[in-house]
A protein has these predicted regions:
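Conserved PLP-binding catalytic core of the aspartate aminotransferase-like
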Residues: 125, 140-184, 188-190
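PLP-dependent enzyme catalytic core of the Aspartate aminotransferase-like
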Residues: 171-175, 187-224
Length: 224
């Protein structure tokens, strides 16, 4: 999404902004001080931060976002009280914390910082551009690419439901995600709400050979 334009509108209207950094955390720098309206940034841990599934981060930048815990009780610090503690971190930590997940996410973040988000992004963008060029030569495919995109590429196989295409790609050894990708309004805007798309995601460990393999696999996809 065009964050600059959205932030400008919300700043003028006095509306706080919560930014979804699901596809950008770990590959794009976000200057949180640049946007006065930015109140929080949320991101999953299992994507470009290389952490385990089931982890994530909600970065609250000020008191405009008063996050409430999903579950309460069992904090271990005020067991004699019937109410949830009102101080941090206890207010947000009910039950047994996901220590293995937190440790894994911390290790993933250390990896990203050691390699550099810019270096990871450059590697992924190179592979995305190569794959997009190869797929655009196939008239049966509609490729959704943009110069500023990160390591994610969406493709629609004309006349083939996204789920069918994904299943055939899986048979060829290519793991993709099919559907609306938690963004139905984006698909409505793109005109793919009814069919969905196939989404391919690259990482720092992806190789040019894998991109070539994916391009070849798309040639085999057909309507069942």
């Amino acid at each position: 999404a065009p964050l600059d334009e959205i932030a400008e509108l919300l700043t003028a209207a006095g509306v706080p902004l919560i930014s979804d950094a699901s596809q950008s955390a770990g590959v794009a720098e976000i200057d949180v001080k640049r946007y006065p309206c930015l109140a929080a940034v949320c991101m999953p841990g299992h994507k470009a931060l290389y952490g385990p599934m089931g982890t994530g981060i909600l970065l609250a930048l000020d008191d405009r976002i008063a996050a409430k815990p999903l579950l309460t009780g069992g904090t271990g610090s005020l067991s004699e009280e019937l109410r949830q503690p009102d101080f941090l971190p206890d207010a947000q930590e009910s039950g047994t914390p996901n220590v293995p997940g937190i440790a894994g996410l911390a290790a993933g973040i250390r990896f990203v910082r050691s390699v550099g988000a810019a270096n990871i992004a450059a590697h992924e963008r190179k592979l995305v551009r190569e794959l997009a060029r190869a797929l655009e030569a196939n008239e049966r495919l509609e490729v959704f690419s943009h110069p500023s995109q990160t390591g994610v590429l969406s493709v629609r196989v004309k006349g083939v439901p996204a789920e069918q295409a994904a299943a055939q790609l899986a048979d060829a050894g290519i793991a993709v995600r099919a559907g609306l990708h938690c963004a139905p309004l984006a698909h409505r805007t793109a005109g793919t709400e009814e069919t969905g798309t196939v989404r391919l995601s690259f990482s720092f460990y992806s190789t040019p050979g894998q991109a070539e393999q994916a391009a070849e696999a798309f040639k085999l996809v057909k309507k069942l």
